[in-house]
């Protein structure tokens, strides 16, 4: 960090020895009385001793901030001003952890005049996940209850079965949230209640579809089509296990490993006491 009487700057930069050019990847600042501390939030008492480069990603941790990374091919936005306004670089943009949707989508079950019977004998649950820059994906949201409303009881004399036990719903209206500005896309997902296979219903590009940030949208699901299947491991990916703080970091088997770390939050009562 370099400092003057009023502002302390924190930088992440790279120098190209061949072109003798400097790239400022991130510029952030802290004002003189330490009230404002933007994006990088470096502290001279907590040195960055652990750095790993994986492809175009530079991972680092200082045991003062959560584990973070940057794309070394990218220049992040500069602060808007040095007069005390927030840094225009979103703090969450450089976190290793990518936040998933905070809750499951909501669904409205309908019986419409569509002829497709895909949902008739299926217990279908819905979820969604966020896509971030650099093709990173969050964990999935929580899953909804099955979209199933039985038809009236109808006992068959021939086989003594309740033939009314089929889905009276053939359409589900799924309401999801578009997420913050660093979310570039949304994938709407479904799975059958008795299966671990997750399928993608729709991939929504926020820019191409004019999707507004942090806004609820609806998607109407009616029929069967050719779905993309997610890898089997996604059903077990309930969350991304990135620590709150980590004192050490290394690369092992193409995985980032953290050591001497802090994870989890203290449980608090209604009064905010731990």
Could you describe each region identified by the protein language model?
Residues 1-274:
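Disordered, low-complexity "stalk" and linker segments at domain junctions of extracellular
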């Amino acid at each position: 960090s370099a400092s003057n009487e009023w502002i302390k700057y924190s930088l992440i930069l790279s120098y190209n020895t061949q072109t003798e050019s400097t790239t400022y990847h991130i510029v952030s600042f802290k004002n003189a009385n330490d009230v404002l501390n933007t994006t990088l939030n470096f502290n001279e008492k907590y040195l960055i001793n652990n750095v790993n480069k994986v492809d175009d990603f530079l991972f680092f941790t200082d045991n003062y901030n959560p584990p973070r990374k940057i794309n070394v091919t990218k220049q992040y936005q500069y602060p808007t001003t040095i007069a005390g306004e927030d840094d225009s670089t979103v703090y969450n943009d450089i976190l290793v952890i990518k936040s998933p949707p905070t809750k499951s989508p909501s669904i409205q079950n309908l019986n419409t005049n569509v002829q497709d019977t895909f949902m008739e004998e299926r217990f279908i649950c819905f979820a969604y996940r966020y896509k971030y820059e650099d093709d990173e994906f969050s964990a999935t949201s929580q899953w909804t209850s099955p979209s199933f409303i039985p038809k009236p009881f109808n006992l068959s004399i021939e086989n003594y079965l309740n033939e009314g036990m089929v889905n009276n719903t053939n359409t589900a209206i799924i309401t999801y949230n578009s997420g913050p500005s660093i979310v570039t896309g949304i994938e709407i997902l479904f799975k059958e209640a008795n299966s671990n296979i997750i399928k993608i219903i729709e991939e929504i590009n926020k820019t191409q579809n004019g999707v507004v940030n942090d806004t609820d949208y609806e998607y109407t699901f009616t029929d069967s089509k050719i779905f993309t299947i997610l890898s089997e491991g996604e059903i077990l990916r309930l969350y991304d296990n990135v620590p709150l703080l980590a004192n050490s970091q290394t690369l092992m088997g193409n995985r980032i490993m953290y050591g001497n770390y802090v994870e989890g939050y203290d449980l608090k009562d209604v009064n905010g006491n731990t």
